[in-house]
């Protein structure tokens, strides 16, 4: 292992330095820091959860590279605000359009994807970034636990429904934005929505982020031959509206080293534009490098039986059936 690899790995395993801005700054000066991202003129990018934080920063980054960006908000007002903020930060001459969908609703997702397929000629990058962390257990309009519906079911439906457009634009990239918190959880066997687990906002958030990583790998296997490359990534510790609202104590403790949203979004934008994303499939990225999905001292890898159970369960929900 090279010296630069040792430094990078040490930062990653330290968590505190690797997930904060010091890790990104150190990695950027290492000799093997990946180049790019390059220009994206003529390409179309769809970003969910684009109203603030990492999602907004990603939209700004893509627009700055020349991509046509669709910013998704759950209401017309939120989508318009996201588009205005993107233009304000990226420049008035960028191509940014608001699109509307409550991603926790299956009907809304179907209506949105139907319209999107009718209105758009291509889709080069899909970024699934929308996230929630309710204080108490809540359910979507379809009766699905809200964190699961937003983080796991919604990306699943968007990928499935938009695959024809992604395949037509191949090579294309899907980026599921997850969290380093996924390292602390395993998927619960026989209980995908954690109905048998007392509700804990942080635990449910992390568990659904773990599920995102697993579903990403499953999609990557299925879509590779169509030229659609599916990846997951985590942004590290970024100073977002969600962190301020849902994790104020954590934010206060990590404030000296917490990343800006743009620093958190760096790998999202890079993956959307770099050849590394289309040369690989199903990887879990942080700071422009693939990372392990488990660590020695963290909960172990999920069994193939549990992984397949999750896939079948989400598929059944997406198609209006309970497994």
State each model region's role:
Residues 5-9, 19-24, 208, 254-295, ...:
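C-terminal helical subdomain
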Residues 44, 51-53:
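Conserved glycine-rich cofactor-binding loop
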Residues 65-81:
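Conserved glycine-rich Rossmann-like NAD(P)H-binding loop of the short-chain dehydrogenase/reductase
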Residues 76, 98-114:
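The beta1-alpha1 cofactor-binding region of Rossmann-like NAD(H)/NADP(H)-dependent oxidoreductases
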Residues 89-95, 115-128, 134-140:
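A glycine-rich helix->loop->beta "capping" turn
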